[in-house]
Amino acid sequence: MKKIKEKDKMEILPVKSLMLRMGVPMILSMVLQAVYNIVDSAFVSNMEDNGELALNALTLAFPLQMLIVAIGIGTGVGVNVLVSKSLGEGNGNYADKAAGNGVFLAVVIYAAFLIFGLFGVKLYIGTQTANGIVLEMACDYLRICCVYSFGLVFFSLYEKLLQATGKSVFSTIAQICGAVANIILDPIMIYGLLGCTKFGVKGAAYATVIGQIISLAVAFIFHVKFNKDITNNVKNIKPAANTILNIYKIGLPAIIAQALMSVMTYGFNLILGTVSEAMVTAYGLYYKIQQFILFAAFGLRDAITPIMSYAFGMKSKKRIDDSIKFGSIYTTVIMFVGLAVIEIIANPLSSAFGLSGETQLLCIGAMRIVSASFIFAGINIAFQGMFQAINGGMQSLIVSVCRQLVLVLPLAWIFTVLVNKSICGEWIIWLSVPVAEILSAVISVVLMKKLYQKQINNKTEA
């Protein structure tokens, strides 16, 4: 059996400080991931020709981009938890097998999106718009993102492997390298600066995938050089049905949870399209702006999950309790700060994009109303990570389905009907998000109490 250190920081550091130590780099990493989406939008919206149409095109492409992220990160979460739990149990050989099978799955995932990028993009975009200019720009952008998506898919894996062993600072450095490259390349490739060809919307896509490939390269180097808890062996890449099943027992709810963001965004695009094209553009921009806050909660969740999973493997009730306590406190603080920031800077932030007066007002209204849901959204996100850590994948899935599908889209549709009948103003549509998050938070708390009794009280030691 592979030799495992008896004591390491995942086992002996107080959860209160360990969560900050691991969480801060992960938060930064996730916020930087949001940079990819918002930076592209900022630059294309200020293009000389058709800036607002270009922003609309990116909004239509966004659900599929999020699906790539969902499957990549969800698979990574499954590998992350399995590796972390195996190391906590002292089973290093199985941790190696889980990591190797993660590589195999990343190859399969990339192949699927490569095929979609070559043959399925136009059909998908065509379901959301009849505007020829928007259709062409959205297809150009999304095709590039899919064909070169190997950077995003494989980075998601190596990022989670670094996080699984407590080396989240390295994954953050890799994310920073890609984000900086993206920010630098965006204006150069979109506007044709420094002698570069003026690519327009295509330039935004090229800058994005180049940044992702750079992040992958750096993360892979860090993994090979510093992730000594995991042995990299080609034989571990050979697919093992049982290992893959275990990865997706954990990861599938995470994939569905992330994919539901795609479904929700796609659904909102269709629903809001019955009101006006400006509503779709405003929604797309507000959604990317709010990701800076929500992704911070996702980052902390990604620290909560391996810490709590490791404690679950140790059967340490105290460390599990501390994970729940401090995970909830830290997440609430993050979301409260995010709420305050959005309320204060909604106006100047939206003005950074080349929007018409109507679209900007709609975007400001969306930000101010939806930000009221941040505290409850944070509770839901944190609890989803906790559920995953203690074999509560189904509970995590239930919360995701409630907050991003079952509750929010029917409410949005009902409110849109009221708007189209001139019974209410457009602002009421945004209320669907806070209402859905509040109801989902109640469901989260109830499910946690039941799962805690089953998994923690009966199966762990003090």
Enumerate the language-model features and the residues they cover:
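Short alpha-helical transmembrane segments in multi-pass integral membrane proteins
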Residues: 1-23, 83-150, 197-252, 308-373, ...
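Small-residue-rich hydrophobic transmembrane alpha-helices
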Residues: 55-115, 152-171, 282-346, 377-399
